[in-house]
């Protein structure tokens, strides 16, 4: 049994970081262009946002869950291609919350993977407020999650307003209230 998490986007890349191994955990680094078989024009893309790909093994069963989708499809798809991650292997999609830097690459992923994703693939979101329009601190448009676009791509939308299980392996929490110190 085990869990592997690949970071596809996280605001940062450091091509000179070295792998780390400790008991029960191994951290591999990706980002440079000196990998065998990868042309020098190809490299890891860093940008604002978050995307992770979790692979869990339970007995002889393996499940793959993509958590968040970064800010742009260009970076998400580029990084997926860089490490050879096939969208057809995804068993579930999870969105942590409705900010553009977490869902921005989703529709591009769905468009690029049309006809390749598993039938009935589910997207777990925390609730209806994930679809709210948001504004930046300066009052600009921060985007909103496109429900019609998601449904048109054949994705099964799961409003996880209570804890849920994604792909039979991953627990998705319900909404976590935001509290400020003010």
Task: Identify what each model region corresponds to.
Residues 43-48, 56-92, 108, 115:
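Pre-active-site segment of Zn-dependent metallo-hydrolases
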Residues 15, 74, 99-103, 130-133, ...:
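Active-site environment of divalent metal-dependent phosphoester hydrolases
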Residues 90-101, 128-182:
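Metallo-beta-lactamase
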Residues 1-62, 167, 172-182:
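Zn-dependent metallo-beta-lactamase
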Residues 104-113, 135-136, 143:
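Metal-dependent catalytic neighborhoods of phosphoester/phosphodiester hydrolases
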């Amino acid at each position: 049994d085990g869990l592997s998490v690949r970071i596809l986007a996280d605001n940062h890349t450091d091509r000179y970081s070295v792998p780390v191994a400790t008991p029960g955990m191994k951290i591999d680094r990706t980002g440079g262009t000196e990998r065998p078989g990868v042309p020098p024009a190809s490299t890891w893309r860093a940008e604002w946002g978050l995307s992770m790909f979790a692979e869990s093994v339970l007995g002889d069963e393996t499940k793959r869950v993509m958590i968040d989708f970064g800010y742009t499809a260009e970076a998400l798809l580029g990084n997926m291609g860089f490490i050879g991650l096939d969208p057809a292997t995804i068993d579930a999609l999870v969105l942590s919350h409705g900010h553009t830097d977490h869902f921005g690459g989703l529709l591009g992923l769905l468009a690029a993977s049309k006809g390749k994703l598993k039938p009935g693939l589910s997207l777990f979101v925390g609730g209806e407020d994930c679809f709210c329009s948001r504004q930046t601190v300066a009052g600009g448009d921060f985007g909103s999650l496109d429900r019609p676009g998601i449904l048109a791509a054949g994705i099964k939308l799961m409003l996880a307003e209570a804890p849920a299980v994604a792909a039979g392996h991953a627990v998705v929490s319900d909404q976590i209230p935001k509290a400020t110190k003010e």
